[in-house]
Amino acid sequence: MKQTMDKPKRSFRRHLTPIRRHLSPIGSGDRIDYKNMSLISRFISEQGKILSGRVNRLTSKQQRLMTNAIKRARILSLLPFLYNEN
């Protein structure tokens, strides 16, 4: 027969760190649109690549809209696909 020994129960308190909410770099009045070049240019690297959502601090929905706006601006020749290093 097995003898079971009950371990004393301890209450564990997790040290909760406060979650910081980062303010979105896009203001409430700014609209994500392919024509808004001043906004779009902030989310493109020097090489012309689209920056990731972590770097941008955008939500996933905002990142999706921004990516579509950048691609649309590239197709309409408002933005270059590549930047020359010359």
Swiss-Prot record:
GO MF, one example: structural constituent of ribosome
* Pfam families found in the cross-reference section: Ribosomal_S18
Q: Where is the signal peptide?
A: none
Q: Name one GO biological process term.
A: translation
GO CC annotation: what is one? chloroplast
Q: Does the keyword Ribonucleoprotein apply?
A: yes
Where in the cell does this protein reside? Answer: Plastid, Chloroplast
Assembly, in brief, is: Part of the 30S ribosomal subunit.
Recorded family membership: Belongs to the bacterial ribosomal protein bS18 family.
Alphabetical list of PANTHER family matching this protein = 30S RIBOSOMAL PROTEIN S18, SMALL RIBOSOMAL SUBUNIT PROTEIN BS18M
Q: What is this protein called?
A: Small ribosomal subunit protein bS18c
